[in-house]
Every structure is written in structure tokens, then in C-alpha cells.
Regions:
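Exposed, interaction-prone extracellular/peripheral surfaces
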Residues: 1-43, 56-61, 70, 79-92, ...
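Glycine/proline-rich, flexible active-site/cofactor-binding loop segments
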Residues: 46
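Contiguous, often N-terminal, cationic amphipathic patches that form binding interfaces
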Residues: 50, 70-72, 76
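N-terminal juxtadomain amphipathic helix
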Residues: 63-65
Length: 278
């Protein structure tokens, strides 16, 4: 590995991700009746066990709540969900494919993406929620199933740093984001929050159906970390090269209006984060 790749802002460090918990992690909160990580009490204890729904089994669900009849009827595991519990689960998806591995400032866009995702993860862990994580790079998709607490955030931080190292070493475009979205649908239970940190070009129109399906019963948000040149491009013409072709052109600030509108039709929220967000 070259010294350049090991420079701060390029090589993602586990220590910096763990340090993001300072000031946000708290202890002491009511425990839900459910043993599934991320379930929080929606009503006071003893308020009853009214059936809310029967849904697909998700990683981390309590196997004791499997509904035998629905499972036998559909051929896939289904669980019962009750009104005394509600899901407080956050799934983080960090995109480390080639378009994220660059930056004109001191930090790669991919590093800021990881920092932004982990910061949201620490905030969720602080309120007692469960957190899961996925990362996509040229090698495929890595997954940390649902869990909670300090150890879970440590596992997520180590996975992201390791997967980012791999992304820097192998480069390449990687699989379509839809591959991660389909797995996310199996990992995140209904009612969960899903944060996808990617670039503005991360979603092809052919992937909209997978994104819409994920957002059908979940709260999905797309976060795009902005590079300095995205928000404040230099005033002078810049050289632009595409293979043997090249020319000078003036750059304009990136406008995400059309992307935000497109995502809104899919019931997905859009957020752009400035260079200082990571």
C-alpha cells in the first residue's frame, strides 16, 4: 500500500469511527417486551399483547414469535408483531464503489460517507435502537446483521474500514446498487429506517423498482456527501479529459433538484451533506 493511500482522509480508520460516539452515547432506557434488537415499547408495560401484523421474518427477529400457520401457508418464515412493541431499527448502507473513491479536498467522498453513516449509527445506538450495516464495493456486498450497543457499532466500524481498504486496493465499478437494496429488504424489518450514503449518480433508473420496494414499508433516506467542487467550483475554466479527448469548461454547482424530485415519487427522502459533514 502506498503512503498516499495511507494518508488521513484517504485511508478510513476504525479509531476515527469509534471516536464519533463521543457526546452522543447514553445509557438507561425502558426495555421492550420483545427480545428482538431494536424493538422499543410503544405503550406502558402491561398494556396488552394485541396482534399488530404478521410479517416476513427478518434477521434478528425472535424465533419464538414465528407464526406456524402463516409460515406453513407461504413456505417462508413469518413472525407475529404486537402493538406493545415498535421497531426502532436503522440500516446503514455505505457505497464504496469507484465513483465514491475521489475528492478534491482533504477527504475522499467515501470516507465522508462512512463518517456520516457511523455518526447516524451512534445516534441510533444512543437511543437504544438496533443498527445493521451494509457496504458495497467492487467485490460485492458486506453485511453486519441487526444488533445493538457498543459492540455492534464496533463491529460496524471495523467492517466499514476493512471494506473501504479493499475498495482502495481493488478499485473497479462493482455491482449495481440494486443488489444491496434487495438484500436490505430482507435485512430491515417493516418500520425500520434505512440510510443509503452514495453519490448522485448512484441510482440508475433501472434500480428504481428495487428502491421503491424497499421504501414501501420502511423510512428510506438517501444521503449524498458533497465534494467542495460540487458546491463551490473554481471560477476559471478547468481541463476535462475523457480518454484521448480533452477540453476546457466552466463547472457549475451540482443541482440535485431533479434527483430529489425523482426520489420523492418513490417515497424516499433526499439529503445533501456539505464537505464538513464528515
Amino acid at each position: 500500500m502506498s503512503a498516499t493511500l495511507d494518508a488521513p482522509g484517504i485511508r478510513l480508520q476504525v479509531a476515527e469511527l469509534l471516536a464519533l460516539r463521543e457526546g452522543v452515547f447514553q445509557v438507561g432506557r425502558p426495555h421492550p417486551e420483545s427480545r428482538r434488537p431494536g424493538a422499543v415499547p410503544a405503550k406502558a408495560a402491561g398494556a396488552g399483547m394485541d396482534l399488530r401484523e404478521i410479517r416476513d421474518f427478518a434477521e434478528g427477529d425472535d424465533a419464538r414469535r414465528i407464526d406456524p400457520a402463516a409460515t406453513a401457508r407461504t413456505g417462508t418464515p413469518h413472525v407475529r408483531s404486537f402493538y406493545e412493541d415498535r421497531d426502532d431499527t436503522l440500516l446503514l448502507i455505505a457505497d464504496f464503489r469507484l465513483p465514491m473513491l475521489w475528492g478534491t479536498g482533504a477527504t475522499l467522498r467515501s470516507v465522508r460517507a462512512a463518517r456520516a453513516a457511523v455518526r447516524r449509527g451512534w445516534q441510533a445506538a444512543a437511543r437504544g435502537a438496533s443498527v445493521a450495516a451494509m457496504s458495497i464495493n467492487a467485490a460485492g456486498v458486506a453485511v453486519i446483521p441487526i444488533g445493538s450497543g457498543l459492540q455492534q457499532m464496533s463491529r460496524i466500524s471495523h467492517m466499514l474500514a476493512r471494506w473501504h481498504d479493499q475498495a482502495l486496493d481493488i478499485g473497479g465499478e462493482g455491482p449495481p446498487l440494486a443488489q444491496a437494496l434487495l438484500r436490505a429488504g430482507r435485512l430491515a424489518p417493516p418500520g425500520a429506517e434505512v440510510l443509503i450514503v452514495t453519490n448522485a449518480e448512484g441510482f440508475a433508473e433501472t434500480e428504481e423498482s428495487a428502491l421503491a420496494k424497499l421504501a414501501r414499508r420502511r423510512h428510506v433516506r438517501v444521503l449524498v456527501p458533497l465534494d467542495p467542487i460540487d458546491a463551490v467550483p473554481p471560477p476559471q475554466p478547468m481541463p476535462i479529459h475523457a480518454g484521448a479527448l480533452g477540453k476546457f469548461a466552466r463547472l457549475r454547482p451540482v443541482d440535485h433538484t431533479s434527483l430529489a424530485q425523482r426520489l420523492r415519487t418513490l417515497n424516499v427522502h433526499f439529503e445533501a451533506a456539505g464537505d464538513d459533514a464528515g
